Amino acid sequence: EDWLAEPEKEGKNDLLVLAGSEYRDFPSLKGGPLGHRKVLLFETKGCDYPVGVYTFNLSMYGVSYWAGSVVGLSSEDSELLDSTLVLAAMPDEPVLEEAIRGYSDGFYAQGGRFCRTCYLADGYEGFAMPDSAYRMLGRIGEGYWMVYPLLGGSAAGVYRYSREVLWTPTIGMDVDCSSITTAVFFSVIRKMDGVMEMYLGDWVAGKEWPVSQTLGLSSGWVDIVVSPRLSDNNMATMVEACRTEAVEKDREYETSKH
């Protein structure tokens, strides 16, 4: 806030990068133009900000639809594997709700029967409560074919539970998590560092950014990676089989919002 209030310095172009989850509704960003300053809000959609504020978002709908489709397809021949569990850090967070919707849509489209969603906390603290995630899995019990942990740092509790208590098939999040636990069959990859590098490179080069940008499956910045130990397994075949439909559903989803 102090940075935004400071007078501009001649010949200086400043950049502030902020997480939209914490700052998208920050009052100071709703004020007047920022002059030569730029603010980049990541994990944020829309362009209802003054000149100088830019947003980008890695869409979670398509890649989550893809993940849900794989889980639904892998459960189609067994009533013992027809339920899946989504553990989310908090309710009413747009990125998480988009992921939950995509995952459940894909799961049901491939014949899954029951997708349950549980929330770890009421606010953003849910992203940093791995011990609580560990305990919550213990309370929920077994019987779910695949856990989708939309938890940020709290996902560490899910992986630890699968190692120490009950081997629970799990989807890795953000990076390839196959080295953390053998319970990870595949991981949803979000190449946030690569996108940030692209934006910063363009800024240094003096290139103009799009005011707002959503990057989905077709962009390559979100993806699914099968755990290396399963690369020759039927799981890898199912992941590839579900890709094309997921890309199309992602495109339809983004188009429907405009």
Write out the residue ranges for each language-model feature.
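A residue-level marker of the well-folded mature domains of exported/periplasmic proteins
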Residues: 1-258
